Regions:
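A non-transmembrane, solvent-exposed segment enriched in polar/low-complexity residues
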Residues: 1-87
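N-terminal, charged low-complexity regulatory/assembly segments
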Residues: 56-178
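Generic structural signal for alpha-helix starts
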Residues: 84, 180-184, 219
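Residue-level detector of well-ordered alpha-helical segments, enriched
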Residues: 87-96, 184-189, 205
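Conserved small-residue packing positions in alpha-helical repeats and bundles
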Residues: 100, 104, 189-194
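Generic helix N-cap/helix-start motif at coil->alpha-helix transitions
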Residues: 147-150, 182-190
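Long, charged, low-complexity terminal extensions
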Residues: 169-186, 197, 203
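N-proximal helix/coil linker or "cap" segments that precede and/or mark the start of modular domains
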Residues: 194-222
Length: 222
């Protein structure tokens, strides 16, 4: 079933007609025009169920192998559609992030499923996650990419934090050190501040985080 929002693919010089009944968004949505096929495909991908939570029970090597197999499978299905090269290349990247964002939850699920194991991510898992760039501005409109970004910087930036008191500062520093794109940096810092406010019912204790936010996210045209 579709959520009440869906990413669309648009391209200069191409046309797209959208038909939808607001009272039945999921059941009535369809597309026409030169980009109708691509956007119908994206709708199908949003509905498709391709990830089984039982995968989290696999050991690290088996899990990463399964994630790579899922990516290969979805890419082959995409290539069989014979869409234009520009969309196909972008969609291959989005597919990777759609798997990676689910894979990023593996350590948490693994520890919950096997609490006595004291699991810590090894090089196989860490290398797999780090193979997905966090500086991919072309995909900032894709939810899978944005979700992966947030998960990844939270995982990396909160390492070594003492409890939860200053973990946001560590994440902010990680963003400053690793993110090159001003657009991506602004998105991540905005989400980090928003999450801090929600978790702490305000901005008390967020002096450093807010100083970074104001420095990096101020509109230069104002």
């Amino acid at each position: 079933m579709l959520h009440n929002a869906l990413n669309l693919y648009l391209s200069p010089g191409e046309d797209l007609e959208i038909y939808v009944n607001a009272k039945n968004f999921s059941g009535s949505l369809y597309f026409r025009g030169s980009l109708g096929g691509i956007n119908s495909y994206l709708k199908e991908q949003e509905i498709a169920v391709f990830f089984d939570k039982d995968y989290y029970a696999l050991n690290e090597e088996e899990f990463v192998q399964k994630m790579r197999a899922l990516i290969d499978e979805k890419v082959k299905l995409l290539e069989a559609k014979n869409f234009d090269d520009s969309f196909t290349e972008l969609e291959k990247q989005r597919i990777g992030y759609s798997i990676a964002v689910r894979a990023s939850l593996y350590p948490s699920f693994r520890r919950n499923m096997y609490p006595d194991e004291d699991y810590r991510p090894g090089s196989v898992f860490s290398d797999f996650l780090s193979s997905f760039s966090i500086n991919n501005e072309r995909l900032i409109g894709a939810k899978d990419y944005r979700d992966f970004l947030l998960n990844y910087v939270y995982i990396q930036g909160s390492r070594g934090a003492q409890g939860w008191e200053n973990y946001s500062d560590g994440i902010a520093d990680y963003i400053l050190a690793t993110v090159n794109s001003p657009t991506i940096k602004s998105f991540l810092l905005t989400q980090l501040v928003y999450n801090y406010i929600c978790e702490n019912n305000g901005i008390e204790g967020a002096d450093y985080l807010l100083s970074v936010f104001h420095q990096e996210c101020t509109d230069p045209n104002k």
